[in-house]
C-alpha cells in the first residue's frame, strides 16, 4: 500500500518580464493579479490546478494545456503575462524571468512511499537538513 507524506506547504511564485510594472513589487498579492494574464501549465500530479489556486484573484487565466517549456518562458518574458509555478521551482525560471514570491498557497509538497517507511523518510530528511 502506498501513502502520501507531506513535507511542506508551498506557495505560488510568478515569473515576470523584468521591465513590467509588476516587476517592481517585492511580493505578489492576490489583488495584484486582477485583469492580469497568467499563463498556467498543466500538471496532472498536482493537488490542485493553478486555475483553482488563483480562481478568486480576477486574473485572466490562460491554460497552456502542457507542462512549461522554453516557449512558455519566452511568452512570459516578451508579453505582458505572468508565469505561475510552485516557489520551490524558482531556480528553473530565474535565469530568464524575474521571480516574485507570493503568499498564495500552492498546496503541499511531499512524497509517495510504501506504508511503514515513514521512519526511513524522517531519517533521510534529518540527514539532508544537517548537510544544508
Q: Residues of each region from the PLM?
A:
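Flexible hinge/capping segments at coil-to-helix
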Residues: 2-12, 16-38, 122
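Short amphipathic alpha-helical segments and helix-helix/interface helices
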Residues: 4, 30, 50-54, 72-74, ...
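Extended ligand-binding regions for polar small-molecule ligands
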Residues: 18, 31-34, 105-132
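Secondary-structure junction motif
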Residues: 36-58, 121
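Beta-alpha-beta core module
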Residues: 1-5, 10, 71-119
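Short beta-strand-to-loop elements that line the ligand-binding cleft
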Residues: 40-41, 59-70
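Alpha-helix boundary recognition
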Residues: 8, 34, 55, 74-78, ...
